[in-house]
């Protein structure tokens, strides 16, 4: 996900995307601890997506 895809969205859409990504991050961390995660790099990608969404939310303020 790129910032250019995010910056045109509304605050409500960004809030729902942020919630979804945080839930995804939680499940990925759980899978990592139970040795079910095949690609650990997914965690860092989701963290970066969360940071991009937060940046877009702060830009709207």
From Swiss-Prot:
InterPro entries: Ribosomal_uL29 (IPR001854), Ribosomal_uL29_CS (IPR018254), Ribosomal_uL29_sf (IPR036049). Keywords: Ribonucleoprotein, Ribosomal protein. Disulfide bonds: none annotated. GO terms for biological process: translation. One of its GO terms (cellular component) is ribonucleoprotein complex. One of its GO terms (molecular function) is structural constituent of ribosome. Pfam families: Ribosomal_L29. Gene3D superfamilies: 1.10.287.310. Belongs to the universal ribosomal protein uL29 family. This is Large ribosomal subunit protein uL29.
